[in-house]
Amino acid sequence: MEQKRGMRKTRVGVVVSDKMDKTVVVAVERHVQHPLYKKTIKRTTKFKAHDENNECRVGDKVLIMETRPLSKEKRWRVVQILERAK
């Protein structure tokens, strides 16, 4: 019996650290509205993502996708490098 896998979450972010082996830290920015003042504020979340070939560098814009837990904190993997750092 085949099971269909649900749609996995994807995010676009910027690599802020590539110091680890096969892992990068990706900062994903989102905009939320302040509950009282209704001003739109930027909020940043950092995700640890699997980078199999150590291709990503700091400043690269990447697409990450949710995956099974790979370690204690790593649940995302780099799918594609959208834009290289200058």
UniProtKB/Swiss-Prot annotation:
**Entry keyword RNA-binding:** yes
What subunit structure does UniProt give?
Part of the 30S ribosomal subunit.
A biological process (GO) of this protein is: translation
Q: What is the stated purpose of this protein? A: One of the primary rRNA binding proteins, it binds specifically to the 5'-end of 16S ribosomal RNA.
Q: Which HAMAP family match?
A: Ribosomal_uS17_B
Q: Which CDD domains match?
A: Ribosomal_uS17
UniProt name for this protein = Small ribosomal subunit protein uS17
Checking InterPro entries in the record gives: NA-bd_OB-fold (IPR012340), Ribosomal_uS17 (IPR000266), Ribosomal_uS17_bact/chlr (IPR019984), Ribosomal_uS17_CS (IPR019979)
Please give the Pfam families that the UniProt record associates with this protein: Ribosomal_S17
Keyword rRNA-binding attached: yes
Provide a GO CC annotation, any one: cytosolic small ribosomal subunit
Regions annotated as coiled coil: none
What organism, scientifically named, is this protein from? Answer: Caldicellulosiruptor bescii (strain ATCC BAA-1888 / DSM 6725 / KCTC 15123 / Z-1320)
Which family is it part of?
Belongs to the universal ribosomal protein uS17 family.
Keyword annotations from UniProtKB, A to Z:
Ribonucleoprotein, Ribosomal protein, RNA-binding, rRNA-binding
Q: Which SUPFAM superfamilies match?
A: Nucleic acid-binding proteins
Q: Which GO terms describe its molecular function?
A: rRNA binding; structural constituent of ribosome
